[in-house]
UniProtKB/Swiss-Prot annotation:
It comes from Escherichia coli (strain K12). This is Uncharacterized protein YihM. PANTHER family: BLR5974 PROTEIN, HYDROXYPYRUVATE ISOMERASE. SUPFAM superfamilies: Xylose isomerase-like (SSF51658). InterPro entries: IolE/XylAMocC-like, Xyl_isomerase-like_sf, Xyl_isomerase-like_TIM-brl. Pfam families: AP_endonuc_2.
Amino acid sequence: MVTINNARKILQRVDTLPLYLHAYAFHLNMRLERVLPADLLDIASENNLRGVKIHVLDGERFSLGNMDDKELSAFGDKARRLNLDIHIETSASDKASIDEAVAIALKTGASSVRFYPRYEGNLRDVLSIIANDIAYVRETYQDSGLTFTIEQHEDLKSHELVSLVKESEMESLSLLFDFANMINANEHPIDALKTMAPHITQVHIKDALIVKEPGGLGHKACISGQGDMPFKALLTHLICLGDDEPQVTAYGLEEEVDYYAPAFRFEDEDDNPWIPYRQMSETPLPENHLLDARLRKEKEDAINQINHVRNVLQQIKQEANHLLNH
C-alpha cells in the first residue's frame, strides 16, 4: 500500500526499476530450441530491460551449460554490447552444480548466481545439508566478485531461509523472493515478504492461483493480473525496501502460465517434517497439434507480462503522486 511515508521513495525509484527478462517465460520455446540464449538478449534489449536471468540448462543442446569457453565469451560480449547484465541460475545447491554455475557466470561476465536446494529428508537434516552447501559457496567463491541468491522454492519456509542466510555470515549471499513459491510451504505472500524482507535483493515476478490441497496449498501459475497474488502490494513493498538506496537490485519477469507446484508443507506437520524430493521446475508441453499455437502464446504472454508490470508500476506511481499532491 502506498502511504505518505513511502510515496517519495516510490517516486525516486519506480521509473528506473531494474527489470530483467527471465528465461522461464520462454520455457517451452527453449525446451524445443525455438528460442536460444542469444535470442533472450535481443528480446531484453528490444524491451529496454536491464538484463537477463538464464538457467544453465535453458536451450537444451544450445544451453550455456553446453557451450564451450569461446561460445560463453561470445554470449557475454553480446550482452555487454547491448548493455545487459547477466544472472545465472541453477536448480541445486551441491558442489558440482555451484561449480558449474559459477564457471559459466565468470566466463560470461555475469554478476550473480541463483541456486535453490532440492534435498529429501527430515527438515533438520535437510537444513544441515544446505548449510554445508552454503559454507562451500562462501569458502570457495566469496571473493569471486559474484553475488549469490538462494530462492524460496516451495519447500522451505521464510524463517528457515532467513536463518540459513544469517547463519552463513556470507556478505554476498541474500534471498531471492518469488511472488508465489511460498504458497507451497503453506505461507501467504505478504507474510512471507515481511519475514524475508531484510535479506531480499532479487525477485521473480509472476502470478498464480492458489489451489487448496488436503492440509496444504499448491499454486498454478497464470497470466499476470489474473491470479491470487497481491501483485501491486508486493511490488510496492519491494520497491520501498532499503532506506537510502534500493535494496532490490533485480526484478525477474518470470511469466510461467500453466506451471503447477503441489503442496510441500502442511498445516498438521510436526516440527521436523519430511521434505520430499522434487524435480526441477517444468511446465507440461501440450499435444502436438496444439504445440505451435502454445509456443506462440508463450511468447505473447511473456511480452504482455512486461507491459502489465510496467502498467502496475505506473499505477503505483500515480498513487504516490496523488498522495503527495493532495
